[in-house]
Amino acid sequence: MDENKQRALAAALGQIEKQFGKGSIMRLGDTQTLDIESISTGSLSLDVALGIGGLPMGRIVEIFGPESSGKTTLTLSVIACAQAAGKTCAFIDAEHALDPIYAAKLGVNVDDLLVSQPDTGEQALEICDALVRSGAVDVIIVDSVAALTPKAEIEGEMGDSHVGLQARLMSQALRKLTANIKNANCLVVFINQIRMKIGVMFGNPETTTGGNALKFYSSVRLDIRRIGAIKEGDEVVGNETRVKVVKNKVAPPFRQAEFQILYGAGISKESELIDLGVKHKLLDKSGAWYSYNGDKIGQGKANSMKFLQENTTISAELEGKLRELLLSHAAATDAERAGAEREDNAAADDENF
């Protein structure tokens, strides 16, 4: 760029910062904008799949999946982790189905949790906007988009047609919310349901409710599915769960995580620690015995999980080592990939020149 253009650009940037405030425009390389604060999901493998150690603050996240796949359990786990870090959380229960006893079992401090059960979709989103603009709430869960019923639909007759009302409501609300969420550094998670598109012959017939706006405004979209049952004898005690990161604006997308959700207990952290510990050689497995730092911790996975539950110091130490190892490895892999892409692009530019 020649000298005159550089001076003109510097003057324009100075004018923008004077008018709209410092940080309103910047070069991407000037600051560590991608060092985004995150909140753990309660699942180590999902935190690693997300690339930054959890869900990003100051962003919109969508979690969708079939019924009984673990959507609400995952969001309650996020709330428990956020509260443990001293953050304030709110739960907008549009489905009117929040179970405080189950939430408490998952580690949520229900006494400090802000809960709203709005009558209409407009009311729910206005409450969400007010909480965001307060700057005092760090995590807001909206359960669910499908239950955000427009006021006109509630006041109308059963058979009335209300085409596109919910989609328009979501589009308008997200336009207002996005900038406020960024400025307040608040995490807003929308839970969504799956519907089937009629007449789809090829491709995926599944879609989510509430139109397309949420797909665009979300920085992270998680597809959660139940892939199997966990049994003790003939009794089913939990679900094997898979989460796919179908969209990610803060790290590479399309990574997957698998973990167990136990009924009445939530995400099984100990099961993940054992599986990942063995995989990355922090735990030794000899026959049925598991060992950590040369000391046997249990015979069989169930006994080893019980040991980690009872010995929280060892559990926290193992989790810290795994988190450091896996997240630094993910960051290094991303950096290598980005460097390779830059080299390829430079080579292509040279050839074109």
UniProtKB/Swiss-Prot annotation:
Keyword terms: ATP-binding, Cytoplasm, DNA damage, DNA recombination, DNA repair, DNA-binding, Nucleotide-binding, SOS response
Binding site for ATP: 65-72
Record GO biological process: DNA recombination; DNA repair; SOS response
Localization, UniProt: Cytoplasm
Pfam families with a match to the protein in the record: RecA, RecA_C
GO cellular component: cytosol
Region (Disordered): 334-353
Keyword DNA damage: yes
Domain of life: Bacteria
Main localization, broad class: cytoplasm
InterPro entries: AAA+_ATPase, DNA_recomb/repair_RecA, DNA_recomb/repair_RecA_CS, P-loop_NTPase, RecA-like_C, RecA-like_N, RecA_ATP-bd, RecA_C_sf
GO molecular function, a single term: ATP-dependent DNA damage sensor activity
Regions of compositional bias (Basic and acidic residues) in chain numbering: 334-345
PANTHER family assigned: MITOCHONDRIAL DNA REPAIR PROTEIN RECA HOMOLOG-RELATED (PTHR45900:SF1), RECA (PTHR45900)
Function summary: Can catalyze the hydrolysis of ATP in the presence of single-stranded DNA, the ATP-dependent uptake of single-stranded DNA by duplex DNA, and the ATP-dependent hybridization of homologous single-stranded DNAs. It interacts with LexA causing its activation and leading to its autocatalytic cleavage.
Protein family per UniProt: Belongs to the RecA family.
Protein name: Protein RecA
Source species: Edwardsiella ictaluri (strain 93-146)
